[in-house]
Amino acid sequence: MADSLADIKKDRRFWQRMLRFAGYYDGAIDGILGTKSKAAAAAWDEDAQRIKEVYGTFDERTERNISTLIPQAQRAARVWCAEAVRVAKESGFDVRIICGTRTYKEQDALYAKRPRVTKARGGQSMHNFGLAWDFGVFQGKTYFGDSPMYAVLGKLYKLVPSVEWGGTWKSFVDQPHLQLNKYPNTAAARAAFES
């Protein structure tokens, strides 16, 4: 999985699609980082910095993962995370965002893993479009993959307009998953991303 925005930027075509999808770029998806791409990236960076200043910063891992999201999702993730950190701390836990954007290639590699950890191939997950993040519950360095805190923290999505929580899904409950509810389904998000 992309560990930072720098990892996302290595796939130049994917990065241009992210910039276009987020509304910063209207040039060709050609993998050439010319004047338009650079200006779009600078605008993204400026907005991301403003969002950080307004909504605060978190631990290094969370910051790396938030940075991979489109700025609108970064804002939502920061609002959710501020409250989640407070609530987790009251119960003796830590919360970190452990995954943000994944390229299609990274999604396919995750799909191929056994045991199966996702039902989505590349282009079939909101993570592929910078709209989704997963969180983890910790005590110090100890990760809890299964904890009642996932339900407690996941329900905080209600405090953030336009965010949905995977814990409310009927067919595939995904308690660590939150996403910006900008598109009615993954197919619509993919169509917008690839247009």
Language-model segments: which ranges?
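Surface-exposed patches in mature extracellular/periplasmic domains of secreted proteins
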Residues: 27-30, 92-102, 162-172
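Short, conserved phosphate/pyrophosphate- and ester-handling motifs at nucleotide-, phospho-/glycolipid
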Residues: 34, 103, 127
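Active-site acidic/histidine clusters and adjacent loop/turn architecture
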Residues: 57-96
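Catalytic cores and adjacent binding grooves of peptidoglycan-active enzymes
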Residues: 120-195
